[in-house]
Amino acid sequence: MAVFGVLILLSSFLLWKWGLTPNARTLVIPLLIVGLIPVIAGVSATISNNKRLIEYESMWNNDQQQFKLGEKARVEGFDEIFKYSYPAAILLTIGGAILFFLVGSPLWKSISLCMMVLGLMAYIIDHFAAERAIIYLEKINESLSDY
């Protein structure tokens, strides 16, 4: 995720440095904002995951069955997040597309393009996160049924 954000930030920098048209110039700040979101999210997720690994290891060593039950409850809670994130991603993407065709100014066209990028990025991330959650939950359930 952070790598994708860095690529967007690089695009923003390149447009700032060499973009000559009004549309290129107005994309700089919206792309900068859209690029910072996955960079910050990716870095903070990596830091928090590394901290949780130590905690998870000690929880696993203390009581494996309780750890699995806790993980099952945590992963099942992801469905609540996806109920809201999928529609938000779709609304951002479609809203950006509609806005792009309704407005004429380069700034609003740039904002609408960045809305579409943000929406697609959110949908792609959530799609793969949901897939991983399903696989993880299946493994947890298999492990719990072994006992």
What would you call each of these model-derived segments?
Residues 60-82:
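Short membrane-interface loop/juxtamembrane segments of multi-pass integral membrane proteins
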Residues 1, 79-86:
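Short, amphipathic, aromatic/basic-enriched membrane-interface segments that mark the entry/exit
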Residues 41-44, 48, 121, 125:
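Hydrophobic alpha-helical membrane-associated segments
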Residues 26-30, 84, 110-114:
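Alpha-helical transmembrane segments of integral membrane proteins
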Residues 43-62:
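Membrane-water interface of transmembrane alpha-helices
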Residues 1-39, 88-105:
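Long, highly hydrophobic alpha-helical transmembrane signal-anchor segments
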Residues 108-145:
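Alpha-helical transmembrane segments and their immediate juxtamembrane interface regions
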